[in-house]
């Protein structure tokens, strides 16, 4: 027998990385919010890699922070190591990566949630949604509690009909042997949602005391203080190294001999796995010309002996995993503490979502994270933040927020999902962003802080610091553009020392900085600023001046694209009435229901001829609309 358990503005189902961001954002925006999760001890749990960031993903964490989200602040307080990646490359692909103390990460984020006003955290399993007249009105739990809400956000991760697989062993489970969610998945199918079956995996964990680190290569963190959050002022300098080793020919032989026992190759696994995070079996088979593969040994925290064996994701049986580990240099006598496994789960086809992450089938229902077909904590957190923001906006009667591809990697991620869909777990890559020179690690605050403030997630104090930083950047750029550096002896000597060509005439300081061998610090030696500038301001000045031409070119591309984005398509347009559209294009347009000509042009199967026909049709005002009957 059910009972009325309360009424909320926003209900979030799940408390993983998507759910935490969704719940915190909604509550901080002023919505009365409830977070429901199967197990309170698993809030913000890291079931796979104990790390945050990396190429593209690290930029997403910066974007989450710039908008007022929590992931960046939380990892800054709880990491054991931090490194800037791709420092030898251009600014567009640089990214920060932190090794997490996964237990501290969980503890700190749960504490933040518990202390946040407007936010209630409760342990309970949601089995059904309350849906009336095509609108979501709340949820019903396994215990019969009925919670009503203006909006609901589903962030169930890999729990929907989750199954763990190792060799020929297969059983119903969420990650890390947690209770899976079976009934909710079945209920979503009843409501008419198309679901797909995806798979991901995790490697074994081993005991640090049984590793011979002398046979591995140390991978220390950066000496320079690093942080994801623009608010962080206290840095953790007591870092713990990771270690690099490699598989051996014996490892590969053992895998080859036992491929028939791998769930990946025996037919036990039906779900599609992540292309960019293959299992060790997959790597050995697909890249059989390579004599070895990298293995990183990553501590799971400061107060545990568990070490994550990065690069050894597997669905081989337990006995093979133990033998395989002991063929790796440094792990000859290792003790395995947890086995690796594959996990299959249900995800919804993401083209069933609007760019706000609201479902098209049911109003006021949003989804975020791995349920949308993505992989990765960062991708989940970015979606969770946007779903939470938009659910709160709907509940408060405010305009919803959609980030464009030119605004953020989060915008690229969501647009790819809702426009193109995905037939495998989606991972964000820098190559997916056509405006990646604009979407850098260093300028996330310049891109998104204004939006964060408008929606109420950025404090006035933080906004004031941001505007001061912006002003200092502009003033320093103007100063360098107005100063002429003459070919004095000390100038020529500095240029010679760094391998540059001597000056023939005077040159603007900004033009001298554009030379590839020149840095801001070199210019500062020649024409020092009277104002003390932070490293972040100096970095912005250098990048904006050095790459000005390329940035300008990208901005022109954005303006051309915006013309297409500004050509809106009515939501209720009847594509069947446009007889000259190709049949494939018509079906894809009906499935995705793009909101603009720009979005329509990115749908696979819709070619330029179809776009031209659609454009003419709309501009002539011949809009046949689908009947609401």
UniProtKB/Swiss-Prot annotation:
GO terms for MF: flavin adenine dinucleotide binding
One Pfam family from the record: SAM_GIDA_C
Primary localization class, coarse: cytoplasm
Location of this chain's protein in the cell: Cytoplasm
InterPro entries the record matches: FAD/NAD-bd_sf, GIDA_C_N, MnmG, MnmG-rel, MnmG-rel_CS, MnmG_C, MnmG_C_subdom, MnmG_C_subdom_sf
GO biological process: tRNA methylation; tRNA wobble uridine modification
Binding site residues for FAD: 14-19, 126, 181, 370
Gene Ontology CC: cytosol
Keywords for this protein: Cytoplasm, FAD, Flavoprotein, NAD, tRNA processing
Binding site for NAD(+): 273-287
Cofactor(s), by name: FAD
NCBIfam families: mnmG_gidA (TIGR00136)
Similarity comment text for this entry: Belongs to the MnmG family.
Function according to Swiss-Prot or TrEMBL: NAD-binding protein involved in the addition of a carboxymethylaminomethyl (cmnm) group at the wobble position (U34) of certain tRNAs, forming tRNA-cmnm(5)s(2)U34.
Subunit structure and binding partners: Homodimer. Heterotetramer of two MnmE and two MnmG subunits.
Record-given protein name: tRNA uridine 5-carboxymethylaminomethyl modification enzyme MnmG
Organism encoding this protein: Bacillus cereus (strain ZK / E33L)
